[in-house]
Amino acid sequence: NFVDLVRRGTYDGTMFHRVVREPVPFVVQGGDPQSKDRSTLTSQLGSGSFIDPETAQARLIPLELKFKGEDAPRYGRVTTNPSELKDLELIHERGSVAMARSQAPDSASAQFYIALRPLPELDGRYAVFGQVTSGIEVVDAIQQGDRIQSAKLKTP
């Protein structure tokens, strides 16, 4: 989903509409397609989804969690079981990139966040899909209202 949205240019010009650093570092969140429209108030952001141009419907992505020792991910189900959490393949570490969503586990669409510190309280509840491997100082400098000029895929 994220790769497809980058290729479509969905993130180009979107705003980081939620930056939480106080009282302790938490996340920088962006990717709301509504934020491309500069007249949209920041208070209205956080609920936007990617609207698929072919279907004119919101593209919603189920929660996806991958556990060590299992061949396939589990979809659509939150886990808070400590014995399962220890087997998650991707957890919330500083620099983890994850899908933002509403309370419904299958409501992720385009919005994402970057963890500013380890966030074990989110493990098993939100899908981590990437990691900042360089440039964490850029993430640390993001301010609410900053915009993504252009998102590009980097091939190894």
Show which residues each predicted segment covers.
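Cross-family detector of peptidyl-prolyl cis-trans isomerase
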Residues: 1-156
